[in-house]
Amino acid sequence: FGRFFAGSLFDIYGGVFARPHLFDPDSPPRKKRDLRVSAPEVHWFETEDGAQIRLTRYQGGTKGPVMLVPGLAVSSQIFAVDTIDTNLLEYLFANGYDIWLLDYRYSIELPTATSQAPVDNVASYDFPAAVNKIRTVSGADSIQVVAHCYGAITFHMAMLAGLQGVRSAVSSQAGAHFKVVGSNRVKSGLYLDTLLDRIGVDSLTAYTDEDADWLDRFYNTAVRLNPTIDREEMCNSSVCHRITLLYALLYEHDQLNTATHDTLHEQFGVASMNNFQHMGVLAREGKLVSAEGEDIYLEHVERLAIPIAYIHGAENEAWLPESTELTFNWLRENNDRHLYSRQVIANYGHIDCIFGKDAAEDVYPFILNHLEKSA
């Protein structure tokens, strides 16, 4: 008991020297709570360039349809986590929406997660195919979109490339302009993504578990020494440390409950190097450009002349709040200024705006309020 008690204290207060917490893949599956939604309706379909992608429908009513689009190295399950009392899927379902969860080609639930296809292909092919699928199946003339992070970035690319059939959108944490924290600015400035690609690294993952080999375990130890993490955000989760190293701190720890933090390995996984390279280009350019760095998007600002609400965590360290402020001001200067709104969420970071323990009270009402105006 003494050794266990001392070990527990050390795990809590030992900082980088505490034992890392790793998921045991051989443990029995955890019991998940039943979600307060209907049975899912799954639709697989092919994009024009041959990618197999997926939409999962939950028909909570006749409002919408609304398509929920996740970020990078995750899946649409970020909207349906069972570890919080009410997730965004359940929230919109209870409010009468016809909800469609999109898993585009980089979703960690699809075999194409490590595809090296240009990110522009998501905008050019995945979004049009998904919007057309929803309109065809539902019979709706147009849809609404709630897009998070990389999903929001590629949504802006898609709209600026001429996407049709979207009547309003909520953009979480990202837009068409980018400001990054110093550590990410250094990484992009050193072209670390390009360097890794040249030495044969074709993907990076936040996932790790107890079966990790010696190299993975060494990496797990190394990432705990990340000097950019504030002491108040220190923890013993190797997955959490990997997430922070790859992307920046994506949440305020006090906005996640223990169950969500303990199951981050279920939500985060692999991403291909072409995605990291494109994010590096965006960070360096400060605006939407193609994978080759071509300025092909912002010249069509009129294509974003739909109602868009921007939501940004005040503590976001992936894309700083100034990012969506730049996009918000740019749109208001060039289109009808009344089409756009922006809400900065105090005490929230990045993805905690999606699955934070109190997101249903602190964040979701802003999403719902915007959707209701064009439901």
Where are these regions (language model features)?
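Conserved alpha/beta-hydrolase "acid-adjacent" motif
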Residues: 317-323
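Short, surface-exposed "cap/lid" segments of acyl-processing enzymes
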Residues: 47, 54-109
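Alpha/beta-hydrolase active-site loop
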Residues: 117-137
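Short beta-strand/loop motif that positions the catalytic acidic residue
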Residues: 304, 310-312, 316
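Alpha/beta-hydrolase-fold enzymes
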Residues: 1-14, 136-141, 150-290
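Catalytic active-site module of serine/aspartate enzymes centered on a nucleophile-bearing elbow/loop
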Residues: 334-375
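N-terminal cap/lid segment of alpha/beta-hydrolase-fold proteins
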Residues: 27-59
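Conserved alpha/beta-hydrolase "nucleophile elbow" surrounding the catalytic nucleophile
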Residues: 70-72, 143-152, 313
